[in-house]
Amino acid sequence: MRYMVYFEVPIEVGNRIDFEEGGPGPIFGHIMERFAPDAVYSQAGMRAAFMVAELDEAQMTELMVVLSKKLGTYPEFTPIMSAEATMEVAAKAIIEAKKAP
């Protein structure tokens, strides 16, 4: 499934990584190569990014582990669907939700 992944790197971790050999390049290079995002947007003024990528369950878990262990952050995964798919999913979900006691 396609996801928008958002993460913020804590300032202490970012400062440490900036002064390591190669800076943030090696870890971000690994993330780009391994997960092949379609788009990456950095947030001006802070160490944060949005990434759009096609991920299965194992890749989501792997990315969460990489980001938490290497960058000290837990990513937020937001599913991305077309408008048509969203309408179809929402319609089914509402029907099922109405069955709840």
Predicted regions and their residues:
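Conserved, structured core segments of small domains
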Residues: 1-101
